[in-house]
Amino acid sequence: MDTIKKLYDYGFDNHKYQKFMGIPKTIDNDLPVTDHCPGYGSAAKYIATSMTEIIADNDSFGATDPKLCVVEIMGRNAGWLTAASVLSDDSDCDGPDLVYCPEVPFDMNKYVSSVQNLLKEKKSIVIAASEGLRTADGKLVCEQAHDYEFIDAFGHRQLSGCGRVLANTIAKETGYKTRCIEFSILQRCATHLASRVDVDEAYNAGFIACEEAIKNNSGKMVTLQVREREPYICEYQTADVHMIANIEKKMPLHWITRDGSYVSKEFVNYVSPLVVGSLTPYYAGGLPKHMNRKYRNGHKVDVVTI
């Protein structure tokens, strides 16, 4: 929302009359004021679904081939996406064994001890870990991977390697077979697993932003406010973009267990309504088709290639 804030401030200071409305859209779900952000529900749905499938695969080897799998999930400073992995805990799956979010300092010794205790009870272990885990002294766990460091235009360090560090540490300490899986960009582009609630709310947020601009409102962001979670009722409001830009909303600490290795039932109640419903993609040749942005006669057009 920083761009909307800057555009609005520039227009106001220079007596320009364009209208600037913000529409939240981040799978990170880390914007303040709004209950949640469009995009998050679909990403959470993908993460929980994939986690269920990974756990089923890991369990299929049984005691004959014990192994540990660490799933690295996006989340620089906020654990909303990683926490969504617990939705896989259902009648057909026990969910991840450990869940580590960046809001709580990561302790490698406690982590190793927790895994060793789990290994006394089971031979198949799956762990969800945020890419942005930091130790108590503020150091990124992923830095121990010694990967090439890329800095983006905003000065953000590309985070990758946390999962490998956690998996390799257990392999070294126990001799067990370990594996690291990074969802990376898959968690934000898997439209075949989009949440119906999420898609509807994204559309509504855009529609309301346009309505507000037509009413001469500007410098605001559409917010989603959940009035009821059971049954689910979401309302749309607007808030001053200055209350939102450059402010990060993290997971409430009381939604994370005291030892920092799992999340609470309160979080499950929060996220569950956001992943409800599905969409049927358009298929051709057995594969889902996607809309592409292409140029025709110098203009961008939306094209579905069949």
Spans of features found by a protein language model:
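C-terminal non-catalytic interaction/assembly regions of soluble proteins
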Residues: 143-306
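Flexible loop/turn segments at secondary-structure boundaries
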Residues: 1-3, 29-30, 77-79, 135-137, ...
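Short glycine-enriched, charge-decorated loop/helix-capping segments at active-site entrances
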Residues: 35-38, 195-196
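Glycine-rich, charge-decorated loop segments at or immediately adjacent to ligand/cofactor-binding or catalytic sites
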Residues: 28-36
